Amino acid sequence: MLTLDTLNTMLAVSEEGMVEEMILALLASPQLVIFFEKFPRLKNAVTADLTRWREALRSRLKDARVPPELTEEVMCYQQSQLLSTPQFIVQLPQILALLHRLHSPYAAQAKQLTESNSTFTPALHTLFLQRWRLSLVVQATTLNQQLLEEEREQLLSDVQERMTLSGQLEPTLAENDNAAGRLWDMSAGQLKRGDYQLIVKYGEFLAAQPELMQLAEQLGRSREAKSVPKKDAPMETFRTLVREPATVPEQVDGIQQGDDILRLLPPELATLGITELEYEFYRRLVEKQLLTYRLHGEAWREKVTERPVVHQDVDEQPRGPFIVCVDTSGSMGGFNEQCAKAFCLALMRVALADNRRCFIMLFSTDVVRYELSGPEGIEQAIRFLSQRFRGGTDIASCFRAIIERMQGREWFDADAVVISDFIAQRLPDDVVSKVGELQRLHQHRFHAVAMSAHGKPGIMRIFNHIWRFDTGMRSRLLRRWRR
């Protein structure tokens, strides 16, 4: 069967103009105009999607099939073009019958042309074919427009769904134009209103806890250098030149007080010969207050020292991915659970704004993984927020999963974030050693977000940074009072 793309080529019908006209009509629709006014950040994201829309429309036109009736009429037209005028006159009754049978829009006009002219001349033959071609072009154009209209309705429906989703999540997740673009890309999934309302709910909770949002931004955009802890830092040799007096005097450099008899000034020696001043001379000698010549030489020598190496490679805007481990034990339930989930949502916001990856791992007895910054990030975030914190605590498995993840090339500059109350068993020595190696050799940073003031110091000692957000009733009341 003939395709629409082939038909357009045969009849020299250009679909580019129709595609552009349809895109402009879509952008001028009231729904999009109102949406762009309300969410200006998403306008650039939608505009960047125009190329994909054009390609989708061209592909739809290219693959569309022409109706059998129109295909048969086009084939008859092509064959008629090859006939001479006498041959065409012989075939004319069959052509008129075919047009009538196919209910062609040109059937009535073709019959009128034939009946109104008793003699079928070559000029009439040319006119007949020209008008027939014009009728076919009109039919092809109408078919293109019908398909584009169907696609426009479908595209507008999809865009409206994505606009609704993006508009709901924009205040929570879109901090800048880059985040708005990634949010728009992620909105292409099949989501229902009830699904993403969970993100809206935790976004409202996060807005009610500004200290939690501020903590996430400080952690995500920390400008501190990646430093190696001093107790584990390797020693390096440093060589410096030191200036010091030589052992052999070279020249008179001035006068000083002292007890060097060989370098006494003549007036001091004169007092020794006066009986009344002799005791005064000895007193000043004992107290090293006699005036003497200062004879100095100079020398330079190389001084070799060893000291711990502290790396100060300042990473003003870290761009590595986040590996976030969330404790889902029973002690992290209730308000702790809400804060942990909202904090992860805040890190997702930072990751989208800075074009970073955000990888979530839940640890209790098993490790569950979610990628919040991928193409299906919204769906993954909904699944994560739907989890319940009712398991045990196996923080060692969490660290082993982090260590394993950091071995990959794409995670070489990742920052690890562990969210817990840190009320757990001590870490095995091999885990502590491996974490120290990652910090020392690869400058990976390990952050702790402590949800309790009673975390075990032995566990928290291995972290580069400890960010405290006490969820106790007293701390919650103090935070509310300070707002």
From Swiss-Prot:
It is found in: Cytoplasm. The keyword Mitochondrion does not apply. Pfam families: VWA_CoxE. Signal peptide: none annotated. Its main location: cytoplasm. SUPFAM superfamilies: vWA-like. The keyword Aminoacyl-tRNA synthetase does not apply. It comes from the Bacteria. GO terms for cellular component: cytosol. InterPro entries: Uncharacterised_CoxE (IPR008912), Uncharacterised_ViaA (IPR023481), VWF_A (IPR002035), vWFA_dom_sf (IPR036465). Keywords: Chaperone, Cytoplasm. Homodimer. Interacts with RavA. NCBIfam families: PRK10997.1. Component of the RavA-ViaA chaperone complex, which may act on the membrane to optimize the function of some of the respiratory chains. ViaA stimulates the ATPase activity of RavA. Belongs to the ViaA family. PANTHER family: PROTEIN VIAA (PTHR36846:SF1). This is Regulatory protein ViaA. It comes from Salmonella paratyphi A (strain ATCC 9150 / SARB42). The gene is viaA.
